[in-house]
């Protein structure tokens, strides 16, 4: 059995868990998330804990049990605390601002880049060079942050571009004569 799957997921007070066949729904103060659990995984919900066990005789059942446990743990954390991603814009003239549910980015192109945030993700710009994204869905917020970063990835010579707040960009040395 996977080491990750051996640890049960504790369900805090104020969080409702509904298990309908292989469909697991978690509801909390930050919203509601649901996920289909793989058929090779047996899920049990009792005494405010969720346990995951691989079904016998199925290939990769151990791995699926560990994956399911990690995903459900992220769902529980998401509906209680939520997830935050911070992006920084580095470069002369690089700016961001919120227009309703859309992030307007000036990234040195001849046009402004408008990125609409999907339902379940909220954004704010405390300064012109900073974007803060918040969501209950860890996968969704990571994808949105990656999409925004992909407009102008940090380049290796000056480090200009959109980067995660905790990202370290390795700077290359310029060519010598």
Curated annotation (Swiss-Prot):
Intrachain S-S bonds: none
Molecular function via GO: rRNA binding; structural constituent of ribosome
Coiled-coil zones: none
InterPro entries: Ribosomal_uL6-like, Ribosomal_uL6-like_a/b-dom_sf, Ribosomal_uL6_a/b-dom, Ribosomal_uL6_bac-type, Ribosomal_uL6_CS
Cellular component GO terms, alphabetical: cytosolic large ribosomal subunit
Keywords in alphabetical order: Ribonucleoprotein, Ribosomal protein, RNA-binding, rRNA-binding
PROSITE patterns documented for this protein: RIBOSOMAL_L6_1
Superkingdom, taxonomy of origin: Bacteria
Listed GO biological process terms: cytoplasmic translation
UniProt cross-references to Pfam families, sorted A to Z: Ribosomal_L6
Keyword tRNA processing listed: no
Family label: Belongs to the universal ribosomal protein uL6 family.
Role according to the record: This protein binds to the 23S rRNA, and is important in its secondary structure. It is located near the subunit interface in the base of the L7/L12 stalk, and near the tRNA binding site of the peptidyltransferase center.
Complex formation: Part of the 50S ribosomal subunit.
UniProt name for this protein: Large ribosomal subunit protein uL6
Species: Glaesserella parasuis serovar 5 (strain SH0165)
